[in-house]
Amino acid sequence: MYCQMSVSLQPKIYKNEFFKMQMKTRRIAHLMTLLAISTTISAQNVATDSVAQPAKKSKLTLGGYGEAAFSRNFYSDNQYRYPRKDAHKNAPSNGRFDIPHAVIYLGYDFGKGWSMGTEVEFEHTGTGSAIEIATDEDGEYEHEIEKGGEVELEQFWIQKTFRPWANLRIGNLIVPVGLNNSHDEPLEFFTVCRPEGENTILPNIWHDTGFSLWGEVKNWKYEVQMIAGLNALQFSRNKWAHNAAGSAFEFKPANKYGFVLRLDNYSIDGLRLGLSGYYGLAMHNTYPNEMEEKDKINDKVRGNVFIGSIDFTYEKYNWIVRGQADYGTLSDASVISNIKANTPKESPFDKTAVGKAATAIGIEAGYDVFSQIAKMKADNQKLYIFGRYDFYDSYIHDKSQSNNDYTRVRKITFGLNYLPIPQVVLKANFAERLFLGKYNNEPSINIGIAYQGFFL
């Protein structure tokens, strides 16, 4: 396994649009990086997706996190290994080096309750493209992809704080549905790669443009958001809503809106309980919006999306235990599947069928064995031995749809997390996907190192 879901091919990327988007995102990323390096750090915590609490107050905040990973997968990496399982049963192992995420966070407190926050994320070391002149094709200009990956402006918002219980935030926001989207930094999960279940069926990290009202009251924290809705044509069999928050265009269509609610409670010492949900219409939320016109055959197709999630974190007595359960539904799934299958070949939309529902359940527990060794404990070093269990299904189909057992996955993981200092972790784990159908299991070994924190 590598730090990206391997049960499906990557979405299609069309050349002209790809290079336009990549060149623009590179300019944004380079500008943000130079700006971040030239600034001083602060201590104000102005991000929902923060990596740590800064040490002292000042107007500027600079922080981030990053991960490097090695994976060895003892199964086929062929894209047809599920439908043609017998042909790939004895395939050789394969390995990968990767930089799954490298993030720079920059925030500023303008005063009088006004602040801003930005977060730029480089995935898989970023991306690169170039133009070359071919010497053997009459001097033809050629576009070359020199590096696969992504650069994303994951957060950009401006906030007005009225009271601790009333903060208004407008811009590109983290959507805190599920455990991983609200706690995605590498010190907030034990595995080398982000937990697989939620990362399969939900956008991750889910971020979108809209409005947020949030605050804290005693032992409660709440957040309410109105954002651009998901796109039904980007739901898929292997990843359900994972790609549905994205856009292949230079803007995000927002013909329909989504509504988000998250509540967290801290009443019990060492325990955080979270409840989150999303509701919105997903059909007719693309460009151009032609199928919603009066008297057209698909005008009344709505694609209602509901996602509910419950999660918790318990940290006490040298234990850390985390868990989550998610369930999502999509109305008109079979009709939407037919619409997707008949979109133009050149369109950027997935053509696979989409299920009426998807689910993900995960739990992990780790114990700090260095807590029993006085010297290590005094030096603030930690060594967690952990185990994790996941179950997820990205394609719960209705009676009119075909069955695909390989989307129902159980996964077990065992490993170690060593923290020589609080901001750095070395990770190692063994994992195996166990399929409920007659498919080949998928064992893997992963080793990684990560940091998370503010720089001053």
Where are these regions (language model features)?
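A solvent-exposed, charged loop/short amphipathic helix patch at secondary-structure junctions
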Residues: Y82-K89, W240-A245, N342-K345
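Outer membrane beta-barrel
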Residues: K57-F74, P92-A232, N255-V260, D264-R272, ...
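Cleavable N-terminal export/targeting peptides
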Residues: M1-Q53, L456
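Solvent-exposed loop/turn segments connecting transmembrane beta-strands
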Residues: R96, E123-H124, P203, P253, ...
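Outer-membrane beta-barrel pore domains
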Residues: Y75-D77, H88-A91, A134, Y141-E146, ...
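Outer-membrane beta-barrel biogenesis signature
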Residues: A43-N94, L179, E196, I373-L383, ...
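Loop-centered beta-sheet repeat module
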Residues: Q234, W240-P288
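Active-site glycine- and acidic-residue-rich loops that bind
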Residues: N204, E250-Y257, K300-N304
